[in-house]
Amino acid sequence: MKTFILSLMSLLLFFSATAQTADDIIAKHIDAIGGKDKLSQITSCVTEKNTEVMGNESTTKTTIVNGKGYRNEADFNGQQLVQTVTDKGGWAINPFGGSATPTALTPDEYKSSEDEIYLPDPLFNYAQHGAKVELAGQEKVGDINAYKLNYTNKDSAVSTFYIDPSTSYIIQVVRTGNVQGQETNITISYSDYKKTDFGVFVPYTVGIDMGQFNLKNTTTKVEFNKTVDPAVFDMPK
């Protein structure tokens, strides 16, 4: 009898887990980081970070206007790196990649990064952006048996989101990107979620593995709904 009950409980747990959909998991994620009503109030986000790369440190600033533009700028040993993406295109300055002057992103580079303009992350209101998400089961990320969501944006670029079932936070994203002219799998890890003054939770530690080198970003300041001059997204002539 005891064995039967245990088997029945295991079966019920199995069907409960498999009955979840991608939208169910995303809804829990949205609730965990602040809730739909609060997240819908976000118009912009400006983040300042300390960045460590191969033993070197720099400051990094990321500016996002929801649905309109994304700009990430860093200074490494006097060399300025900038990547900007808007709802219409993008450009970058990367002296380490051979582009010391502003250079337009290639179509493939733009497709893989165009969803950076969405706040708080691309999963929120994804269908309105023309994206699709499917649940691909669960997969280990370290010790966590994370939910695996395959996200396909409107231009068919695919990213894989991993969500911790216990917290509903995004803990990792894997996508294909261009690093120094080569197609590379980029793994982004998120941790140390904290509640901001605005009332939403964001990861204060972000690790980026590009294969050839790794970056670690530690957030020092987050400002939501700050007025942003749209000219910061314009490509210099």
Regions found by a protein language model. Name each.
Residues 1-22:
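Bacterial Sec-dependent N-terminal signal peptides
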Residues 145-235:
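Gly/Pro-enriched, hydrophobic low-complexity segments
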